[in-house]
Regions:
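Glycine-enriched alpha-helix->loop->beta-strand junction motifs that scaffold or abut catalytic
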Residues: 36, 110-116, 134-143, 160-166, ...
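Conserved, mostly hydrophobic/aromatic
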Residues: 13, 32, 40-43, 110, ...
Length: 259
């Protein structure tokens, strides 16, 4: 599974699938990849996105009005995989859509589509045994969120359950671009380094090239989500072009090969 980071910092981008529609999402994803995204998180829209801030909430509402479903997201993943063989593809979802499809069926279809990993934002590692068995059976990488408030023993458990990379949440609260990174992020990465050799990606709040470069001084990758979704929201009619331009500005600061 190509969930490797070939430079430092690597760039993980998040998009809400179906905003403004699936066809445009495809163009956005391919534009981001062409501009230098290393991993793409394909966000499944959900009616109650409690972990997300207003930008992604609005995107989910727009996508749901288009009728976007988990099945459509997996079809999109298969299409993108045909065009981008070496880019990591991660499905980013709440648990409910996966349960509605069925965990086993979801994992089978996702693997067939060329998905590499899955992040279920509201599934605690302590309750993930059935999910993990299915993920491992279908050679998918389970990715879990690690928060600054997590005690060391829980970080260890999260790291042991994760494959591909560990997602370090830079701060508590919901998603959303911020002008300044939280000070907890670097400390959390140091704590994770003590319990895992997996790459660590930092997300929640990264919105510009300066923050992206800052994360690269202590983490393996940076996740940019709300800033991407906001770029889409502000550039109706030229979404793919605008995202490509934004990603290119970020990746221009990332030229150091990962070792």
């Amino acid at each position: 599974m190509p969930l490797f980071f070939y430079r430092k910092p690597a760039l993980v981008v998040y998009v809400t699938c179906g905003d403004p529609d699936i066809a445009t999402t495809r163009a956005i994803v391919l534009s981001a990849i062409e501009a230098g995204a290393d991993v793409v998180e394909l966000g499944v829209p959900f009616s109650d996105p409690v972990a997300d801030g207003p930008v992604i909430q609005r995107a989910s509402e727009r996508a749901l009005k288009q009728g976007t479903s988990l099945s459509q997201v997996l079809t999109l993943a298969a299409d993108v995989r045909q065009q981008a063989q070496s880019t990591g593809l991660v499905v980013f979802s709440y648990l409910n859509p996966i349960l509605r499809m069925g965990i086993e069926k979801f994992c089978k279809v996702a693997r067939h589509a060329g998905v590499d990993g899955v992040l279920v934002t509201d599934l605690p590692v302590e309750e993930a045994d059935e999910y993990l068995r299915a993920m491992h059976a279908h050679d998918l990488a389970p990715i879990f969120l690690a928060a600054p408030t997590s005690p060391d023993e829980r970080l260890r458990r999260i790291a042991q359950a994760s494959r591909g990379f560990v997602y370090a949440v830079s701060r508590t609260g919901v998603t959303g671009a911020r002008q300044k990174l939280a000070g907890d992020a670097e400390q959390l990465v140091r704590r994770l380094r003590r319990v895992t050799k997996l790459p660590v990606a930092v997300g929640f709040g990264i919105s510009n090239a300066e923050q992206f470069a800052e994360v690269g001084t202590f983490a393996d990758a940076a996740v940019v989500g709300s800033a991407i979704v906001e770029t889409i929201e502000r550039n109706r009619g030229r979404e793919a072009e605008a995202v490509g331009e934004f990603v290119a500005k970020l990746t221009a600061t990332s030229c150091q090969p990962s070792v």
